[in-house]
Curated annotation (Swiss-Prot):
Ubiquitously expressed. In brain, highly expressed in the entorhinal cortex, inferior temporal cortex, medial temporal cortex, hypothalamus, amygdala and hippocampus. Expressed in liver by cholangiocytes, the epithelial cells of the bile ducts (at protein level). Residues 415-426 have a biased composition (Low complexity). Keywords: Cell projection, Ciliopathy, Cilium biogenesis/degradation, Cytoplasm, Cytoskeleton, Deafness, Disease variant, Nephronophthisis, Neurogenesis, Non-syndromic deafness, Phosphoprotein, Repeat. GO terms for cellular component: axoneme; cilium; cytoplasm; kinocilium; microtubule; microtubule organizing center. InterPro entries: DCDC2_DCX_dom2, Doublecortin_dom, Doublecortin_dom_sf. It holds the Pfam family DCX. It is found in: Cell projection, Cilium; Cytoplasm, Cytoskeleton, Cilium axoneme; Cell projection, Kinocilium; Cytoplasm, Cytoskeleton. This is Doublecortin domain-containing protein 2. It comes from the Eukaryota.
Length: 476
């Protein structure tokens, strides 16, 4: 009974197979594990569908299954063995590759480690100190454009490895300095010597960048910096700095300063406090700026000659003026002289002031006289023009109806004569009233005053006769 029950339980378990499937002709595909369950995969066609979904081959659906070594084609599901390797292909033929070695990690052989431990041997090995080795610092040069004495020099850092490539050095110089002629093709020293390779470049020196044009030999060194500090080899400090002009320290010698410091140290037994590093750097920066200013002043004094004729007199004769005759001055030559060199002129300020005072007094007297006249005979002065206007209006009114009514010219002339007589009487009265008080003063004040015009009324016929007489005279 027990044997039959074991057989029945064994037959009732489903059959499950696991295989590794590769792609046909793909040497980089490591394979895909596919599980074949008896209940789910009942036929070979269903197995092909499962492999198609698992492999996802670029050629499409899987139609054939091959063995990896010989390429034998499998046609039934029973031929597949659990744990085996197979190749899935489409309609194409089998491609023979070493599928079993795809994706396998090759293990390196283990190195034999020597288990013996040697004792430490103490020995003195002579090795040069690291600080003594020269550092590969970049080469620092200062560049000046050809013919440029105004702009300051530009600083350029060139790596040591780049010095062997001269074209690359010229390219770096072109990027640093812009020339009108274009790129930089040559480098010259300040003396005009051509630099042909990077090995000739010296650290901390000045060079002139030249393009396609020729080198312009100008006093670059005199105008930009002092010659004493120009040629100093790299890594060597200056032995002594020039004294600062105008400072108290430059007046005394170094021995005096040393003696003062020793005396001060003997007097004061207490130690002096240490100064901060920042203050020391500030003092050094101030000294450097003063030194630069002194160098510029010294260079400017060297370039400008100290002569009595000044800077406006040329030092040498020009080629254009060679052989030309000098034009001599004569009496007609006009020379502009400054104001402080002109002869003094005497100005009659007193006479002009007296004349101005007299004119002002005369004006004041005349204005006062007019004011008195207006106050005294204000009513008469205001009535006189009104009387004249009334007489004129009356005469016009009388003259118009006479003409209209057909009066004769003799009657009109008599009426005009009467009007003129009346006007003359009014003017005479006015003159007498004004001349009684200030007739003499007015004559003294303004002797050249023109007489007042007399008002005379003429008839239209007289005007026509006068016009005809003038025309006859013009024709004659």
């Amino acid at each position: 009974m027990s044997g039959s029950s074991a057989r029945s339980s064994h037959l009732s378990q489903p059959v499950v197979k696991s295989v590794l499937v590769y792609r046909n002709g793909d040497p980089f595909y490591a394979g895909r594990r596919v599980v074949i369950h008896e209940k789910k995969v009942s036929s070979f066609e269903v197995f092909l569908k499962e492999v198609t979904g698992g492999v996802q081959a670029p050629f499409g659906a899987v139609r054939n299954i091959y063995t990896p070594r010989t390429g034998h084609r499998i046609r039934k599901l029973d031929q597949i063995q659990s744990g085996g390797n197979y190749v899935a292909g489409g309609q194409e033929a089998f491609k023979k590759l070493n599928y079993l070695d795809i994706g396998e990690i090759k293990k390196r052989p283990m190195e034999v480690v020597n288990t013996e431990v040697k004792p430490v041997i103490h020995s003195r090995i002579n090795v040069s100190a690291r600080f003594r080795k020269p550092l590969q610092e970049p080469c620092t040069i200062f560049l000046i454009a050809n013919g440029d004495l105004i702009n300051p020099a530009s600083r350029l850092l060139i790596p040591r490895k780049t010095l062997n490539q001269w074209d690359h050095v010229l390219q770096m110089v072109t990027e640093k300095i812009t020339l009108r002629s274009g790129a930089v093709h040559r480098l010259y020293t300040l003396e005009g010597k051509l630099v042909e390779s990077g090995a000739e470049l010296e650290n901390g020196q000045f060079y002139v960048a030249v393009g396609r044009d020729k080198f312009k030999k100008l006093p670059y060194s005199e105008l930009l910096f002092d010659k004493s500090t120009m040629r100093r080899p790299f890594g060597q400090k200056a032995s002594s700095l020039p004294p600062i002009v105008g400072s108290r320290k430059s007046k005394g010698s170094g021995n005096d300063r040393h003696s003062k410091s020793t005396v001060g140290s003997s007097d004061n037994s207490s130690p002096q406090p240490l100064k901060r590093k920042g203050k020391k750097e500030d003092v050094n920066s101030e000294k450097l700026t003063k030194l630069k200013q002194n160098v510029k002043l010294k260079n400017s004094q060297e370039t400008i000659p100290n002569s009595d004729e000044g800077i406006f007199k040329a030092g040498a004769e020009r080629s254009e003026t060679r052989g030309a005759a000098e034009v001599q001055e004569d009496e007609d030559t006009q020379v502009e002289v400054p104001v402080d060199q002109r002869p003094a002129e005497i100005v009659d300020e007193e006479e002009d002031g007296e004349k101005a005072n007299k004119d002002a007094e005369q004006k004041e007297d005349f204005s006062g006289m007019n004011g008195d006249l207006e106050e005294e005979g204000g009513r008469e002065a205001t009535d006189a023009p009104e009387q004249v206007e009334e007489i004129l209006d009356h005469s016009e009114q009388q003259a118009r109806p006479a003409r209209v009514n057909g009066g004769t010219d003799e009657e009109n002339g008599e009426e005009l004569q009467q009007v003129n007589n009346e006007l003359q009487l009014v003017l005479d009265k006015e003159r007498k009233s004004q001349g009684a008080g200030s007739g003499q003063d007015e004559a003294d004040v303004d002797p050249q005053r023109p007489p007042r015009p007399e008002v005379k009324i003429t008839s239209p016929e007289e005007n026509e006769n006068n016009q005809q007489n003038k025309d006859y005279a013009a024709v004659a």
